Amino acid sequence: MPGIVLIGAQWGDEGKGKATDLIGTKVDYVARFNGGNNAGHTVVVGDESYALHLLPSGIISPTATPVIGNGVVVDPEVLLEEIEGLESRGIDCSRLLVSESAHVIAPYHRMIDKVTERFAGKKKIGTTGRGIGPAYADKINRVGIRIADLFHEDVLRDKVSNALHQKNQMLVKLYNRRAFDVEATVQELLEVGVKLKPYVANTSLILNNALDDGKTVLFEGGQATMLDIDHGTYPFVTSSNPTAGGACTGTGVGPTKIDRVIGVSKAYVTRVGEGPFPTELFDENGEWLRAQGHEYGVTTGRPRRCGWFDAVVNRYATQVNGLTDIVLTKLDVLTGLDEIPVCVAYDVNGVRYDDMPTDQSAFAAAKPIYGMMPGWSEDISQVHAFEDLPQTCQDYVKRLEELSGCRISAIGTGPQRDHIIEVHSLLD
């Protein structure tokens, strides 16, 4: 059975939680490989809605083992709160496995994230202020704390002391904030470590053994392609690699064990935070999409910026991820429009770009070149076969598939778990 990577093909919030839950009922492991609690996804099961931030979406499926890989940065308090919240609603979290090599978001990471963003002024990135970037920075600078360190008091104290020696000076002298007490920070981390210990494991070994034994593993990415630290709209990006390559480095599983890469795209586009967004709408159409799609961030509650489908972005996602399939979500949101614009290329200072400009100055200047598609008025939420969709709706999907350079294998037609059309099997 395969190793399957599921990633966002746009700027996030594409509906990966729903797609993961759909596939997760048929797989043995669901492994989160990047990011932290800056990523939010919602899974709807019947009348119940679950907003997840750090836990893999597969936690809702009773048959899958959820895994937090080494590429994730973990805020222990947030993780424990999320576990407690789900268990209070009857969800069994005892199956959860957390990599002992994952890095920890410490209290000082959150403070640094907030003050640096506040002082950035007009140059702010639009972070969630949850300490993700500073934790990854410590990881790269080799002064980070790993989950395994929470169980070795002397090691932990040494690492916290080393980190705070520099960070306290910055907080006090540059940002006029209070210094963190080393011992208080150590004790706080030790306490959460005790609670986390039952979940901690060598997840790389477990996942590799599972694949070798013929099990199916779903690798779940947080955020999305256009927020990738290397391939996204830098510097308005996240601090990790939400692209397909991150699935390997973020779990310790080699690329030869990946059989399928599925990208999730909305039938339109949204973005949260700062940064260029060529198809962004500033008129009543943008407000309409936001209202119809309930476009507010799961993690931040911020209203999302909305725009028409951008085929240049999707072609780029197909390229950098090696997509084999696309799950198209929220097609129902477009119901009622007479015409639907689709961005087929960019105009950059009079020059046509059919492909993504890697020069971010060019991308910031990109103006969308639209093709128009006829809309539909019928309710599609109860449609379960592609051929039963309105013809203009089918034509829209086929056009997006053609422009993206990748087949659309599943289509989301509403918020419920069963509001989806599986055109091609995502597991065969």
From Swiss-Prot:
Substrate binds at residues 298-304. It is an enzyme of class 6 (ligase). The keyword Transferase does not apply. Keywords: Cytoplasm, GTP-binding, Ligase, Magnesium, Metal-binding, Nucleotide-binding, Purine biosynthesis. The active site is at residues 13, 41. It catalyses: IMP + L-aspartate + GTP = N(6)-(1,2-dicarboxyethyl)-AMP + GDP + phosphate + 2 H(+). Its EC number is 6.3.4.4. GO terms for biological process: 'de novo' AMP biosynthetic process; IMP metabolic process. IMP binds at residues 13-16, 38-41, 128, 142, 223, 238, 302. Transmembrane segments: none annotated. Homodimer. Belongs to the adenylosuccinate synthetase family. Plays an important role in the de novo pathway of purine nucleotide biosynthesis. Catalyzes the first committed step in the biosynthesis of AMP from IMP. This is Adenylosuccinate synthetase. The gene is purA.
